[in-house]
Regions:
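FIC/Doc superfamily catalytic core
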Residues: 1-265, 269-426
Length: 426
């Protein structure tokens, strides 16, 4: 994949920009462009430009961005990024949802745990699929839930990702370090072809190929630069004397692992795991309930373009920061959808339970039938029913037997266990 490089200017006309920005139409144009942080190819064909040519518009836009940009140096590699008012607004919204408690008073602890397990699986599977794991999502979930051993390298990659995500929970009190990077990478690559690269940074050149056409998309820094680049990255991530929003820092961390490419293989998986680690460490615990890699997998071309735009446009990290925030937004929406679904299910179950109590069922029986009506695939046993309702097993057995007699439940044996399931009366 190749994208057109923008025009390069030796000098930017800052004074001309500062004069022109006083014009209302120019100011409105830049505000509109800031919303989506347009790249050169989007500016090039944009109608109603306030300058004489697309090239002049781009030159003034570069001046506009330079004036508000924050600078970052890793070794001899200069980077910069802009925190526009629109990015600030998005960050505020993320804070309200990711720290403010999207789950609060909405779904039960058990449902949260169910979704957490599902999200961990999704993240492990999707992160591996981005790197080429061929195993389907359903097969991968079956493997992890059943505990069976992986049958091929694709399945091993998924197991490794799952274990790495779990390991992150144990490392939240640590600062970012070389050991943390090496440990996460080693877990990610065990028993795969990339295992030979574990435990140390590469000592050979790396040419990153495009996942679609196989062409060289990027040449990573020379191996002699890796240690100083990583050291500067660690300093940036760990320092607290200058505040950068955690989502911005995590996005830059994600990008830089991909840019430095410190390992012979497994860089992308490691970068995404460290993105998670940093944000959870900084208090965004709800992030454990969403899968960023699933959002990335579903927009892989945009993911690659975000890297290329950054590199093509004088290492402007804003493109990748914007992409990270969009992926977070998409992933978060999945959680919102799940929460809303659970609310609807609880409301429906409560309505059914109320109607059944009016028909003579006791509250325990009515609640069970209400629950099973929205979870028809679920089953219940005497011990579980007894424990949930705080009653002795004799009473639990009588309740369930009455429901069987009334044709509401079906009793059957699964192995040595007696289970009760809802009778489909549709």
């Amino acid at each position: 994949m190749k994208i057109e490089k923008p025009p390069y200017f030796e000098e930017l006309e800052i004074e001309n920009y500062l004069e022109s920005i006083l014009d209302k139409n120019v100011k409105l144009f830049f505000q509109e462009v800031d919303k989506r942080y347009f790249y050169w190819t989007e500016i090039k064909h944009r109608p109603n430009q306030p300058y004489a040519s697309p090239q002049q518009t781009w030159k003034m836009l570069k001046a506009h961005r330079l004036v508000q940009a924050k600078q970052l140096f890793l070794g001899n590699h200069p980077f910069h990024f802009c925190v526009t008012s629109f990015i600030q607004q998005d960050l505020h919204n993320f804070d309200l949802k990711l720290i403010g408690g999207l789950y609060k008073d909405s779904i039960s602890t058990q449902e949260q745990q169910e979704y957490l397990k599902s999200s961990l699986l999704e993240e492990a599977i999707a992160s591996s699929q981005i790197e080429g794991a061929a195993t389907t999502t359903d097969v991968a979930k079956e493997m992890i839930k059943s505990g069976r051993k992986p049958r091929n390298e694709s399945e091993q990659m998924i197991i490794n990702n799952f274990r790495a995500i779990q390991e992150i929970e144990n490392r939240l009190d640590e600062d970012m370090s070389v050991n943390l990077i090496l440990d996460i990478h080693e877990i990610m690559t065990v028993k795969t072809g990339a295992a030979k690269y574990a435990g140390e940074f590469r000592n050979h050149p790396i040419y990153v190929k495009d996942h679609i056409d196989g062409e060289i998309a990027f040449t990573a820094p020379d191996s002699s630069e890796i240690n100083p680049l990583i050291e500067d990255l660690l300093n940036f991530i760990n320092r607290e004397d200058e505040f950068y929003h955690p989502i911005i820092k995590a996005s830059i961390l994600h990008f830089m692992i991909g840019y430095i490419h410190p390992f012979g293989d497994g860089n992308g998986r490691t970068a995404r795991a460290l993105f998670y680690w940093y944000l959870i460490k900084k208090g965004y615990s709800l992030l454990k309930h969403i899968s960023i890699s699933r959002a990335i997998l579903d927009s892989r071309t945009s993911y690659d373009k975000a890297f290329l735009k950054t590199e093509n446009d004088n290492n402007d990290l804003t493109y990748f920061i914007m992409y990270s925030m969009k992926s977070l937004r998409v992933a978060l929406q999945s959680l919102v959808t799940y929460r809303d679904k659970k609310r609807e299910e609880k409301q429906k179950a409560a309505e059914i339970s109320y109607e059944l109590t009016l028909k003579g069922f006791n509250k325990r029986q009515a609640d069970l039938l209400g629950y099973l009506s929205v979870k028809p695939e679920a089953t219940v046993t005497v011990p579980i029913y007894s424990e949930r309702n705080g009653i002795v097993r004799q009473t639990a057995t009588r309740d369930l037997a009455e429901l069987v007699k009334k044709g509401m439940l079906r009793k059957q044996k699964v192995g040595k266990t007696v289970v009760y399931e809802l009778v489909d009366n549709t």
